[in-house]
């Protein structure tokens, strides 16, 4: 598994299980010669067009972002028709068996959420600015009540 991280987070990300870590501050991961079966852009910093050359013949690109002008939704609808590289766009659904499965993973220690910072509801503006800064590592939690 390969991922990107800042130089100061490389060892931490390796502890989480990454085999290869690319420092996004000094290297452009889209310039690598490595081919991938799956690329997951969790922060919306890339695009299918940028990542397509990095995907294997049947590779999949998934992003949590809509992309420029909603392009990821368009690609998700049309790329499966051509049988090669494709885009998946996550559409959340509530499914009890998925929640139970996630609960079991957490209880067994297989899934450890990475929490960067906690904010109160009164600090929502500060939390938003921090997330938008691109400096967060993991999740930012907004506490609604104690």
Outline where the language-model segments fall.
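Terminal helix/beta-alpha structural elements that buttress the NAD(P)+-binding lobe
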Residues: 1-146
């Amino acid at each position: 598994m390969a991922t990107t991280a800042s130089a100061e987070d490389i060892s931490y990300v390796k502890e989480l299980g990454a085999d290869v870590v690319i420092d996004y501050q000094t290297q452009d991961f889209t310039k690598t010669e490595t081919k991938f079966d799956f690329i997951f852009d969790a922060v919306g910093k890339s695009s299918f067009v940028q990542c397509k050359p990095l995907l294997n013949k049947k590779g999949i690109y998934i992003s949590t972002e809509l992309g420029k002008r909603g392009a990821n939704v368009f690609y998700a609808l049309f790329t499966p028709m051509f049988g090669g590289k494709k885009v998946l766009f996550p559409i959340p659904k509530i499914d009890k068996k998925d929640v139970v499965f996630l609960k079991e993973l957490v209880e067994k220690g297989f899934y450890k959420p990475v929490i960067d910072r906690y904010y109160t509801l009164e600090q929502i503006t500060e939390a938003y600015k921090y997330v938008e800064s691109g400096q967060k590592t993991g999740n930012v939690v907004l506490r609604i009540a104690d």
